[in-house]
Amino acid sequence: MANYFNTLNLRQQLEQLGKCRFMNRDEFASECDFLKGKKVVIVGCGAQGLNQGLNMRDSGLDVSYALRAEAIAEKRKSFKQASENGFTVGTYEDLIPTADLVVNLTPDKQHTSVVKAVMPLMKDGAALGYSHGFNIVEEGTQIRKDITVVMVAPKCPGTEVREEYKRGFGVPTLIAVHPENDPKGDGLAIAKAWAAATGGHRAGVLQSSFVAEVKSDLMGEQTILCGMLQAGSILCYEKMIADGIDAGYAGKLIQFGWETITEALKQGGITAMMDRLSNPAKLRAFELAEEMRVLMRPLFRKHQDDIISGAFSSGMMADWANNDADLFRWREETGASAFENAPAFDGAIAEQEYFDNGILMVAMVKAGVELAFETMTESGIIAESAYYESLHELPLIANTIARKRLYEMNVVISDTAEYGNYLFANAAVPLLKAHIMPKVGTDVIGKTLSVKDNGVDNVTLVQVNEIIRNHPIEQVGKVLRGYMKDMKRIAVGG
């Protein structure tokens, strides 16, 4: 199979990379009616599979789960999750032939074998759904021409898809129709109905393309969403220990600091996050972020270039063929890191203390978010897509670190994201360790700035505030956050 993106000519590549339209709410007036009375069969019952299925059923759709025969016979986790929630569960042969929409929500690595198994069983004119387009775009899987291929990609982990739905809301979602597989012209109607059934239409839906979703999703998760958080956690902890900060305190400051800092990001963008700092601390964080932006831009561009060209996917699939040797080795190395094994800290850390004593962490977030956004948009990805794949998802990933540190993050994210995370972090750690960490001390990580007063130069402060607030991600973010003002706020600090 050939990489689908690489089979397109330049004009087609740019057209698909740039496909992005924020859909009006009135386009979802009929909600999920288009799929009512039809049979939806989900393949796979992990976090996305279970939670999307629960939402779709609660929206009035007929949902069942097709699992491998051995998963049913051995009563594996997927079988238990589906059956204990009252769903009909059967083998591929039992359920696929009567399905109107087959939704493939298995891990990326399994997509080729799953599609190969289900496609011969699908009836003429059925639809095949994905929540990530890697199999279509990077692996180049070709689907039978009578089958409609659509995507609905919630921009958060599966657990949040369910929690926001239960609150009467939803999560921002990308939808797409594969241009090679829309024989009846009803792909968009199917995708809209599926998105509405999960609640996504209440939080904002982007009509995108398989190509744009894959290329932006891979970039976001490798760099700011996972890779930067992993690199920052390892480096900040090592620095604090070297400078005499209590190990338990250092571990807690990082573990819960990312979540607390990015909650401000979620509510008001980079502007709100930076405004939580004192004026001297804001200027210091800005300086550090600018230095990191210059230092790390080539690394961000390399990752985007490798994603666009397909080099990243080729390397990862080679590791799949090698029984995930690199993935497992990097996972083991992460588990052995000092931060992952930091002792517990029973003391309380006030919310503001995470900002005051985590100036370097704030700077890392600012630099990483802006670099990811800029690198995506200069590659032809539209600003709205770049926002969702950088700033928007960051608090959701930070929340996983708050639960069980980097282990939890790497368990929750996809296998593709985990591999890309290690690839980026393994390059970012030595780069930052050589050029940034020797220049900083406990004044920006572990303690706080030692200043006699909070006085700063007014002209400099005004200039810095203008730069922060006028960054393109702040402009598009203000509009998109307007659709998400009802999203749950998390408890921070403690």
UniProtKB/Swiss-Prot annotation:
Family: Belongs to the ketol-acid reductoisomerase family.
Residues annotated to bind Mg(2+) 2: D217, E389, E393
Active-site feature positions: H132
Name of the protein in its database record: Ketol-acid reductoisomerase (NADP(+))
PANTHER family: KETOL-ACID REDUCTOISOMERASE, MITOCHONDRIAL
GO molecular function terms listed in the Swiss-Prot or TrEMBL record: ketol-acid reductoisomerase activity; magnesium ion binding
InterPro entries the UniProt entry points to: 6-PGluconate_DH-like_C_sf (IPR008927), 6PGD_dom2 (IPR013328), KARI (IPR013023), KARI_C (IPR000506), KARI_N (IPR013116), NAD(P)-bd_dom_sf (IPR036291)
Binding residues for Mg(2+) 1: D217, E221
Segments forming domain KARI C-terminal knotted: 209-344, 345-487
Pathway assigned in UniProt: Amino-acid biosynthesis; L-isoleucine biosynthesis; L-isoleucine from 2-oxobutanoate: step 2/4; Amino-acid biosynthesis; L-valine biosynthesis; L-valine from pyruvate: step 2/4
